[in-house]
């Protein structure tokens, strides 16, 4: 299991938390066990989940600023959480290139989303990359 699988695990955990208000550690342990994740992958998935949850209000505000046509609560749960995960990486993980975060989000959307998910997620993430002022003050501090 590599970083992509760790991201898949993180997405599934965020999805469970979003739907069922499951405790993050319980959801992470159950999901990681189900997929046979190793210690490094579990740790990376944990960092992604906990970081996303820690900054979820800011991340949701970023999405809201660029998705004027769609309210966050009307977006598909999977799409919403793929974007949250990618935006966390883009803004709060300087060790991960933004292009990698976007590409990984698009790959996740191909696996877990609908046929329209890739285009929708790419559009939102692209707007955030193009409009750094719309995103967050954190972006400028990372560059």
Curated annotation (Swiss-Prot):
GO MF terms held by the record: RNA binding
GO cellular component annotations of the record: cytosol
Entries under SUPFAM superfamilies matching the protein: NusB-like
GO annotation terms (biological process): DNA-templated transcription termination; transcription antitermination
Superkingdom classification of source: Bacteria
InterPro entries given in the database record: NusB-like_sf, NusB_fam, NusB_RsmB_TIM44
Keywords: RNA-binding, Transcription, Transcription antitermination, Transcription regulation
Segments crossing the lipid bilayer: none
Family assignment from sequence similarity: Belongs to the NusB family.
Role description: Involved in transcription antitermination. Required for transcription of ribosomal RNA (rRNA) genes. Binds specifically to the boxA antiterminator sequence of the ribosomal RNA (rrn) operons.
NCBIfam families: nusB
HAMAP family: NusB
Protein known as: Transcription antitermination protein NusB
Source organism (scientific name): Desulforamulus reducens (strain ATCC BAA-1160 / DSM 100696 / MI-1) (Desulfotomaculum reducens)
Gene: nusB
């Amino acid at each position: 299991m590599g970083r992509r699988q760790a991201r898949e695990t993180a997405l599934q955990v965020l999805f469970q938390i979003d739907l069922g208000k499951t405790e993050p550690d319980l959801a992470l342990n159950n999901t990681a066990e189900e997929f046979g994740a190793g210690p490094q992958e579990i740790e990376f998935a944990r960092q992604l989940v906990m970081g996303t949850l820690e900054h979820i209000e800011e991340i949701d505000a970023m999405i809201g600023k660029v998705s004027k046509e769609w309210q966050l609560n009307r977006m598909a749960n999977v799409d919403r959480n793929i974007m949250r995960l990618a935006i966390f990486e883009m803004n709060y993980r300087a060790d991960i290139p933004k292009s990698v975060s976007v590409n990984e989000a698009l790959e996740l959307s191909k696996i877990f989303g609908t046929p329209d998910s890739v285009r929708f997620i790419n559009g939102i993430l692209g707007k955030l990359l193009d409009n750094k002022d719309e995103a967050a003050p954190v972006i400028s501090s990372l560059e």
